[in-house]
Regions:
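Short amphipathic alpha-helix with an adjacent loop that forms part of the alpha/beta core around
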Residues: 1-8, 100-101
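Cysteine-nucleophile active-site neighborhood
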Residues: 8-79, 87
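Histidine-centered divalent metal-coordination motifs
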Residues: 43, 92, 133
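Acyltransferase
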Residues: 137-152
Length: 152
């Protein structure tokens, strides 16, 4: 509902099946509200942000559905301290193809084992994306992470 989107302060691009290219309406929403509202992307929503920022989303060699992995904050982040390591819940078969270069999107977190990007930020436009699921019981301090994301 367009009226609800216009009235909200935050837009969450949610997890789901498939690939970002399967959801052209989500791309339109992202492009319309980027820089005007806080946008948070989780899993498919994270991939949707990258897809719209000229990232290539590809099939992973290994599928992670219901896996817990350690992630490391690798760059300065508005949300997390650099070098912090914690466990997160993963449910995905797609990933960002690298190398990826962007003037406005910064990779802030990576899988500690595989080095796959796990979080992005665009502080200038108030955009945050997470390949992992902060709402999952597999994510350490998930409720705290969600509160931090929403209050940033």
């Amino acid at each position: 509902n367009r009226k609800k989107l216009d009235q909200s302060s935050t837009i969450v691009l949610s997890p789901g099946p498939g690939s970002p290219k399967d959801y052209p309406l989500t791309s339109k929403i992202y492009k319309k509200y980027k820089g005007r509202k806080k946008i948070i992307g989780i899993c498919l929503g994270y991939q949707q942000i990258l897809f719209n920022e000229k990232g290539k989303i590809v099939q992973q060699k290994n599928i992670f559905h219901g896996y817990q992995s350690k992630v490391k904050v690798t760059n300065e982040s508005k949300l997390f301290k650099k070098n912090k390591i914690f466990k997160v819940g993963r449910y995905h078969s797609l990933k960002l193809y690298e190398p990826y270069k962007s003037n406005n999107i910064k990779i802030t977190m990576r899988c500690a084992k595989s080095n796959i990007p796990m979080a992005i930020e665009n502080k200038e436009n108030n955009v945050y994306g997470f390949q992992f699921h902060p709402e999952s019981f597999l994510t350490e301090n998930g409720n705290f992470i969600i509160k931090k994301i929403l209050s940033s």
